[in-house]
From Swiss-Prot:
Region listing for Small ATPAse domain (RuvB-S), in residue ranges: 168-233
EC number: 3.6.4.-
Residues covered by region (Large ATPase domain (RuvB-L)): 1-167
Gene that this polypeptide is encoded by: ruvB
Principal localisation: cytoplasm
Function: The RuvA-RuvB-RuvC complex processes Holliday junction (HJ) DNA during genetic recombination and DNA repair, while the RuvA-RuvB complex plays an important role in the rescue of blocked DNA replication forks via replication fork reversal (RFR). RuvA specifically binds to HJ cruciform DNA, conferring on it an open structure. The RuvB hexamer acts as an ATP-dependent pump, pulling dsDNA into and through the RuvAB complex. RuvB forms 2 homohexamers on either side of HJ DNA bound by 1 or 2 RuvA tetramers; 4 subunits per hexamer contact DNA at a time.
Residues involved in DNA binding: R270, K289, R294
Reactions that this protein is recorded to catalyse: ATP + H2O = ADP + phosphate + H(+)
GO CC list: cytoplasm; Holliday junction resolvase complex
Name by which UniProt lists this protein: Holliday junction branch migration complex subunit RuvB
Quaternary structure annotation from Swiss-Prot or TrEMBL: Homohexamer. Forms an RuvA(8)-RuvB(12)-Holliday junction (HJ) complex. HJ DNA is sandwiched between 2 RuvA tetramers; dsDNA enters through RuvA and exits via RuvB. An RuvB hexamer assembles on each DNA strand where it exits the tetramer. Each RuvB hexamer is contacted by two RuvA subunits (via domain III) on 2 adjacent RuvB subunits; this complex drives branch migration. In the full resolvosome a probable DNA-RuvA(4)-RuvB(12)-RuvC(2) complex forms which resolves the HJ.
């Protein structure tokens, strides 16, 4: 039998974020009692914290189909028209990284979200006319790592807006314990704590580490976390080699650095730096953003000495 990590299929199986789960369940129950379509939901937060999983669980709870599309794939009105043409009554449409949807497509979404209707231009030149088309009622769930890029008219059309942030150590430890048992790994409390410490309080990273431990045990017949973390270049607090390189770049400079300079020195695009590297370093107070640029803090310098 092939062993694999099984994602939660119900809200009861979802670990952590109980206040958020309760709010979602309340909205679902109210929509069922009122026999109305569940309000559109916007989920925002860092990568890997379960936004897609929550969308899937909502669809499961509604006993309906989940349609998934990336925001970056909605760049023309026809892209959105194709997406909603596949929707059946009561479906859930999940748009991941919804901030990447083209502005003109966002505007097209407004009447669809409001009244499930869309105006389409048919024909060309003098023979063209605007036709209003009905869309099957559905729930739109948007997910984003960059809430600030969601324009206000679009954000205002979401009835439920939830911040899915990092998890507590206790929540990550519980996940690691569950995933370890699913993979037939006999992890002791110290090993579970070590995995948690190296996960950046992010479920996706914790799952990734558990999978690598499973591979290590299959090949080497034993678990060696210290060796595994060294091979994966995952350091104290879960920082990876690119995070350390970022800190080292700032540490070598005597003045604040702009994002373009950092991008050039690291050879990494701005989007990756701002969305993958900086959020956790800011949260851990290892760097600061000032009007003049990014600077390393004393905590960041201490980390470089001790990691």
């Amino acid at each position: 039998m092939k062993l694999q990590i099984k994602p939660p299929n119900t809200f009861d199986e979802f670990v952590g974020k109980q206040e958020i789960i309760s709010q979602i369940q309340l909205s679902i129950k109210a929509s069922k009692l009122n026999k109305t379509q569940l309000d559109h939901i916007l989920l925002y937060g860092p990568p890997g914290v379960g936004k897609t999983t929550l969308a899937r669980l909502i669809a499961n709870e509604l006993k309906t189909k989940l349609q998934i599309i990336q925001g970056g794939h909605l760049q023309k009105p026809s892209d959105f028209l194709n997406a909603i043409s596949l929707i059946k009554k009561g479906d859930v449409l999940f748009i991941d990284e919804i901030h990447a949807v083209a502005p003109n497509v966002m505007e097209l979404m407004y009447p669809v979200m409001d009244v499930f209707k869309i105006q389409v231009l048919i024909g060309k030149d003098f023979n063209s006319k605007i036709v209003e088309m009905k869309v099957n009622p559905f729930t739109l769930i948007g997910a984003t790592t960059q809430l600030g890029k969601i324009i206000n008219p679009l954000e205002d059309r979401f009835g439920v807006i939830l911040n899915i942030n990092y998890y507590s150590n206790a929540e990550i430890e519980k996940m690691v314990s569950i995933y370890g048992k699913q993979m037939k790994l006999e992890l002791n409390s110290n090993e579970i704590s070590a995995i948690t410490e190296h996960s950046k309080q992010t479920p996706r990273i914790a799952i990734r580490i558990v999978r690598r431990i499973f591979e290590q045990k299959i090949v080497n017949k034993k678990i060696d976390l210290e060796g595994l973390f060294k091979n994966l270049m995952i350091y104290k607090n879960g920082l990876q080699s690119i995070d350390v390189q970022y800190l080292e770049v700032l540490n070598r400079q005597n003045e604040p650095q702009g994002i373009k300079s950092i991008s050039s020195m690291l050879g990494i695009d701005r989007h990756t730096i701002e969305n993958k590297i900086e959020p956790f370093l800011l949260r851990e107070n290892m760097i600061q953003k000032t009007k003049k640029g990014r600077i390393i803090t004393n905590s960041g310098r201490e980390y470089l000495v001790n990691f």
